[in-house]
Amino acid sequence: MTTAQQPVTNTDLILRLRNLVGDKHVYTNAKARKVFSTDAYTFSPVLTEALQDKVADVVVAPGSVSELEQIVSLAVQHNVPVTIRGAGTGNYGQSVPLEAGIVVLMRRLNTILELDVTTKRAKVQPGVIIGALERRARELGLEVPCYPSTWNTATIGGFVSGGFGGVGSIRNGTLWDGMVVSCEVMSAEVTPQYSTLTDAEVLSVIHAYGVSGIMTELEISLVDAVAWEEAVLAFDDLTSALRFGYALSLDEAFDKRLICTCEPPIAGFFRPLNNEISLNATKTHVLLELAQGQTEAVSGLAQDYGGTCVWQRPSDKYHKSGFSLSDFSWNHTTLWAMKANPNYTYLQAMFASEFDTFLAQVDSLKQQFPEELLMHLEYVYIGDKLTPSGLPIVSYQGKTRLYEMIDAFEAAGVEIADPHTWRLDADPRWNGTPVVDGKASRNPLGLLNPGKL
């Protein structure tokens, strides 16, 4: 049941929040409330227009699960909406408070509780930064299966709640492929209840924007660490680069963490990389993370497709230099494009797994939108199926034209996860019934992130 929700104008409630977590962890000034009510929806001009005036009444940063529980209880008692926020790196307004209320910052709940090298699992609080988990895991010979390009700032809870996949998805799949072993979830009730979700039960909170409960602890699967080296290959045309990337994706002789394909002039937008090597603006570039010692052989394979290795970095420099190639992959590709031209935005597209169909889809769309569409492809495994996942860059010509392009993608058989809506149920990746059932049982008043589902 959803009831009419109230703005936080109750000074007694704010006083109780201050007494609970301390003055410095409660934000009521306009600037802070705006900052913590904004995520990376600015990648979308549609969302920017729709969400820019959505601001919380108060922002609170609990320092313990007990404090979090008491905040939630107070909110329910006062019938106030609660929006949980990680680092605010989501792109669809996942952590934007559509109906004001309280934004809860999870950044202080940032403890790696356990890291077991035998079971290859980590127990973490939701505010743990993914980069911190990755670095700690690598010290013990393990690594995170997949992570977003925002890994140095994004929280694990935010990634699980609003993400998909990323670096590593070419070998380990996405969030749905066993990365989340279990999680502890708190309900939004006067007396919050706790549930431990395992196996298929975790589907109710993966990519659910927090509407089906508040994660307080996660158990994450890890994989054996690999010494990764990085390389950039250049190709004369997009088709050759796509043929190479697809072949490399399927070639089990090579271990890959990243295969990112960018048609020209996208790679020219990557300023830190171009400070080391001036990339040819007319070439299609493929960014790779490969197991130590494999760059030479992969470069040989690339020659069969007209490709040349133009830059490489050894494994002992991985994550230890000013940038990594992952800083130019996934939606960081879009970020660098927007820095070069603020008129750019993007789409999220799942192309056909069968190569000839995939290539025909790309060719058709490029013919329809030769001046408006720049292809950016990442290769991922979804379950056991290789899927070219596109984040094509789009020259924004207005909302009507944007949705004409989306219609054209879908007419070509390309599945679009629309990044220009905040509605969870508009995303084909959402889990449907498990999320709805989780919301009914753990968010009975509809106070958690209202308006998203």
Language model features: what each stretch is:
Residues 67-70, 132, 238-244, 293-301, ...:
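Short, conserved charged micro-motifs
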Residues 3-4, 85-87, 95-101, 107, ...:
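Conserved glycine-rich FAD pyrophosphate-binding loop
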Residues 111-115, 124-126, 130-253:
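FAD-binding subdomain of flavoenzyme oxidoreductases
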Residues 235-237, 248, 255-257, 265-313:
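A conserved active-site cap/scaffold subdomain adjacent to cofactor or substrate pockets
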